[in-house]
């Protein structure tokens, strides 16, 4: 009872905090004068991270196994993985270009886990025999970490395509001298202001196009780095799953629906990484491939849970009506 109460408190505190954080985050991106609120949003993200970590530890202690046995627990872990991605650039003292991807992704993931699932799904359950293995934590955690990473990379690529094909990209409002950001994106506001100040006394007629190009290059670089990490994690997760499958079912690969879609996901991102070796495919073309991967990941993650079929159907669920 104590653990259940603690978990309930932690999840609702974290969800409320992240809701406030994303509101502050959007305001600071749009209005430079309120940039001081950025520190508050980062503190909120840290507080939320510790709440989610506390929930996972509490659930682990109460259930006796790592909390990855159903869809609810996996969604909470997925949001926790997104927090990790959010914090990595901060640890490296670099600009957090991922924040506008990770923050809303986290609130949507956690919001669906908290409010979109039946209450029964929130309860910890006894593991079925096939899941009572030391491979549970290794395989499932690697897969979810790869999903979180690949989703962020795919969204960065999708953002690149949106900017690339937008005809008129006006970064700044003409009405104010202090300059307001009209199209908010990835904390680039600080970068834009610094560059604009440096070029204030020079003639630069192609200023908007120049920064459009710079932003596209930056997104392309970040997308490639994030997807490379996610692809590595996905490969490790699939290999761990194959070993576990051999122990549990006597076969490394059964072409179960989940396995099939995991293979499709792996193939899509392998194509993306291979396309990067061709200079003509860097940028827009490879970003298109990565954007397709965004849809494939969600099919792989939710597909079996929605259908409730196959060897990976332990976490299947029914949406509340």
UniProtKB/Swiss-Prot annotation:
Molecular functions (GO terms): heme binding
Keyword Transmembrane helix: yes
Protein origin, superkingdom: Eukaryota
Membrane topology, from the record: Multi-pass membrane protein
GO biological process: cytochrome complex assembly
Any one Pfam family match given in the protein's UniProt record, by short name: Cytochrom_C_asm
Main location: plastid
Compartment(s) where it occurs, according to its Swiss-Prot or TrEMBL record: Plastid, Chloroplast thylakoid membrane
Transmembrane segments: 9-29, 44-64, 68-88, 143-163, 226-246, 260-274, 289-309
Keywords: Chloroplast, Cytochrome c-type biogenesis, Membrane, Plastid, Thylakoid, Transmembrane, Transmembrane helix
Annotated Gene Ontology cellular component terms: chloroplast thylakoid membrane; plasma membrane; plastid
Family recorded in the similarity comment: Belongs to the CcmF/CycK/Ccl1/NrfE/CcsA family.
HAMAP family with a match to the protein in the record: CytC_CcsA
NCBIfam families: cytochr_II_ccsB
Record note on quaternary structure: May interact with Ccs1.
Xref: PANTHER family: CYTOCHROME B_B6 PROTEIN-RELATED, HEME EXPORTER PROTEIN C
Function as written in the Swiss-Prot or TrEMBL entry: Required during biogenesis of c-type cytochromes (cytochrome c6 and cytochrome f) at the step of heme attachment.
Protein name: Cytochrome c biogenesis protein CcsA
Native species: Oryza sativa subsp. indica
The encoding gene: ccsA
């Amino acid at each position: 009872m104590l653990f259940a109460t603690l978990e309930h408190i932690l999840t609702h505190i974290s969800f409320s905090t992240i809701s406030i954080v994303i509101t502050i985050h959007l305001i600071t991106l749009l209005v430079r004068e309120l940039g001081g609120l950025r520190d508050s949003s980062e503190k909120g993200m840290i507080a939320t991270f510790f709440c989610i970590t506390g929930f996972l530890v509490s659930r682990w202690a109460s259930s006796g196994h790592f909390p990855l046995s159903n869809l609810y627990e996996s969604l909470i872990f997925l949001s926790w993985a997104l927090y990790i991605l959010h914090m990595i650039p901060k640890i490296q003292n670099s600009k957090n270009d991922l924040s506008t991807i990770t923050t809303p992704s986290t609130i949507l993931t956690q919001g669906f886990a908290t409010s979109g699932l039946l209450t029964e799904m929130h309860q910890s359950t006894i593991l079925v025999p096939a899941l009572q293995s030391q491979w549970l934590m290794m395989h499932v955690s690697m897969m979810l970490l790869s999903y979180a990473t690949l989703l962020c990379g795919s969204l960065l690529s999708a953002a690149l395509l949106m900017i690339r094909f937008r005809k008129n990209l006006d970064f700044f409002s003409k009405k104010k001298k202090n300059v307001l950001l009209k199209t908010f994106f990835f904390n680039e506001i600080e970068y834009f202001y610094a560059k604009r100040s440096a070029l204030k006394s020079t003639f630069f007629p192609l200023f908007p196009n120049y920064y459009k190009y710079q932003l596209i290059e930056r997104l392309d670089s970040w997308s490639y780095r994030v997807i490379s990490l996610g692809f590595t994690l996905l490969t490790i997760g699939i290999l761990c799953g194959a070993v576990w499958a051999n122990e549990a079912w006597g076969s490394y690969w059964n072409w179960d629906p989940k396995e099939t879609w995991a293979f499709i996901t792996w193939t899509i991102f392998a194509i993306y990484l291979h396309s990067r070796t061709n200079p003509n495919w860097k940028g827009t073309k490879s970003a298109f491939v990565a954007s397709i991967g965004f849809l494939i990941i969600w099919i792989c993650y939710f597909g079996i849970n929605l259908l409730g079929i196959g060897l990976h159907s332990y976490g299947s669920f029914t949406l509340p009506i």
